[in-house]
Amino acid sequence: MTIIRKKHPLIKIINHSFIDLPTPSNISSWWNFGSLLGLCLAVQILTGLFLAMHYTSDTATAFSSVAHICRDVNYGWLIRYMHANGASMFFICLFLHVGRGVYYGSYNMIETWNMGIILLFAVMATAFMGYVLP
């Protein structure tokens, strides 16, 4: 089985990504926040798409479309609250992820750190635009 795992081109990709993945010796629960960020982002995108199917951005009907989502759409209230609370959870995980990077000295890898800071500012700008939308 290990020969197929090491030699087959498609299985080799999965092997290097999941099975023989090098992990640091000091791995702990702090290393979960990157995966939780991906999960939170997927939930935000999914619930955002579902909410966008029923939301009307016209100033005259925006409030009534939100009321329609909460009252008339099946589990619309749940989707709306998952989207709202998911944004807060996303930022909690994001700041804990950055804090873990600072604690473990990840800023020494300059290119990776700079890319993370650019992504942090892009996420914060996107969230600001989401809160400011009429």
From Swiss-Prot:
> Which residues does the record give as heme b b562 binding sites?
83
Electron transport among keywords: yes
Among SUPFAM superfamilies, the record links this protein to: Transmembrane di-heme cytochromes
| Sorted UniProt keywords | Electron transport, Heme, Iron, Membrane, Metal-binding, Mitochondrion, Mitochondrion inner membrane, Respiratory chain, Transmembrane, Transmembrane helix, Transport, Ubiquinone
A Pfam family annotated for this UniProt entry? Cytochrome_B
Cofactor binding note of this UniProt entry: Binds 2 heme b groups non-covalently.
- Organism superkingdom: Eukaryota
Complexes and interactors: The cytochrome bc1 complex contains 11 subunits: 3 respiratory subunits (MT-CYB, CYC1 and UQCRFS1), 2 core proteins (UQCRC1 and UQCRC2) and 6 low-molecular weight proteins (UQCRH/QCR6, UQCRB/QCR7, UQCRQ/QCR8, UQCR10/QCR9, UQCR11/QCR10 and a cleavage product of UQCRFS1). This cytochrome bc1 complex then forms a dimer.
- Biological function: Component of the ubiquinol-cytochrome c reductase complex (complex III or cytochrome b-c1 complex) that is part of the mitochondrial respiratory chain. The b-c1 complex mediates electron transfer from ubiquinol to cytochrome c. Contributes to the generation of a proton gradient across the mitochondrial membrane that is then used for ATP synthesis.
Query: Could you tell me what this protein is called?
Result: Cytochrome b
**Native source organism of the sequence:** Microtus subterraneus (European pine vole)
